[in-house]
Amino acid sequence: MEEILQMSALELSKQIRHGSVSVKEAVEACKKQIQKAESQVHAYVSMDEKILAHRIKEVEEGIKSGRYTGPLAGVPIAVKDNICTRGQKTTCSSKMLENFVPTYDAQAVKQLEDAGMVILGKTNMDEFAMGSTTETSAFGVTRNPWNPEHVPGGSSGGSCAAVAAGEAVMALGSDTGGSIRQPAAYCGVTGLKPTYGRVSRYGLIAYASSLDQIGPIGKNVKDCAALFEIIAGHDSKDSTSADVPVESYDSLVSGGLSGMRIGIPKEYLAEGCDEEVKKALADAVHTLSKNGAVVEFFSLGMVDYVIPAYYIIACAEASSNLERFDGVKYGYRTPGATELHEMYKKSRAEGFGEEVKRRILLGSFVLSAGYYDAYYMKALRAKGLIKKEFDKAFQKYDCILAPASPTTAPKIGTSLSDPLQMYLSDIYTVAVNLAGLPAVSLPCGMDSKGLPIGMQLIGDCFQEKKILRAAAAYEQLRGEFPKAWAKEEK
């Protein structure tokens, strides 16, 4: 069983397709690890044994018959609980959707099932993806597999923790302001936020529609590239879906560092960035420079406007998107309300958690008469200027290197006691969403407390190949990164 957990997703699928490992054995290896670690990690919110047993049989038969021949056929995967799965609860880790069972699959789910992957279950997250720690879930906190006193990051904390703990071989997450990249950094795994529009948002329960994007989480860059190839592509059911062809995962990660120009924004290493994070990034720069890349510092404008612009736009869109959850057609309905207005008020007050209510209030405020121009329109203008700054940078550089977070994973409880500090921790990730760019986060070191440090490579729109190529080359030079679950074995 341990041999199965050691394999990459691509290796495991190869073994399954060659008949050396069965789909059932692969799933059982993950389930054994879930039984061992889940009481401490709490990565999952739901697993349906009946659906899983049926799917194992279906995939095993499909591989034998030649229906499933892809590079990830038979691989067990976890799915974030804001991505719809037909017949299986999709709660957004909220009391508001505690009993919601979708009647359809998200397009990304359909594509990974068409590729022969096996969904293990739904992972915990910050409620409605609003948070950076996976502490705002209505169903309990997810803990970092490296140290259970620390958060796994968020909002895709359950997905990243599941991969780090060996409870899944891969996972799907969503990224609105860093929600794949930051928890991937905290958990020592790899996460890709694709270009906005690359992966269909059909079936993703919306937080901020102009920023949300589904992406892969895995043990290494090549696994993520293979899953990206599967889930990317045009979808007529999503009006923001881009019709841009995706290269094969092999070509996405090939090419090496020779001749690549990589820029580092000076502003990202200023005050607020932990010294150990700076040191790990400096070591990564040395590795990249020594092996053919040209790495230099440059100045990226508009950095001071990134956090305010992001939270104004994201909260405004959230307040609009979450209006539908009123207890009438969708969401929790309070028992015993005597009239309609009371039912609306109580259902939303009882169904949403504190952080979600805070963001709905903030969003409603910036969209209200008298404040719309002063806040929301100004934030949209700032968003356009931020994109122009990146456009300018990409005229000179193939990709931008930055920390994924200013610190390693904080202790549980510290972020929620200071929401402003939690918002500021997104400083390096949110600009990527505002500009609609792709970025990949991967481990580049450990701090003195034994917690992973992550870096991100940011690319121009639809230039996933450049960032994945650089990330794969760096990963090969860095060598095998330790595994959190293997640490527990010792």
Residue ranges and their predicted role:
Residues 30, 52, 80, 112, ...:
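Conserved hydrophobic/aromatic pocket- or pore-lining residues that grip, position, or stack substrates
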Residues 72-92, 251, 256-263, 316-387, ...:
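Short helix-loop capping/hinge segments that flank enzyme active sites or metal/cofactor-binding pockets
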Residues 19, 80, 220:
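Short, conserved phosphate/pyrophosphate- and ester-handling motifs at nucleotide-, phospho-/glycolipid
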Residues 13-14, 57, 270, 302-303, ...:
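Serine-dependent amide/ester hydrolase catalytic core
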Residues 26-30, 309-310, 356-364:
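Short alpha-helical scaffolding segments that buttress acidic/His motifs in well-ordered protein cores
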Residues 36, 114, 165-170, 174-272, ...:
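Structural helix-boundary/capping segments
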Residues 72-214, 267, 316, 402-420:
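Short glycine/serine-rich loop/turn segments
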Residues 1-57, 290-292, 483-490:
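An N-terminal boundary/leader segment
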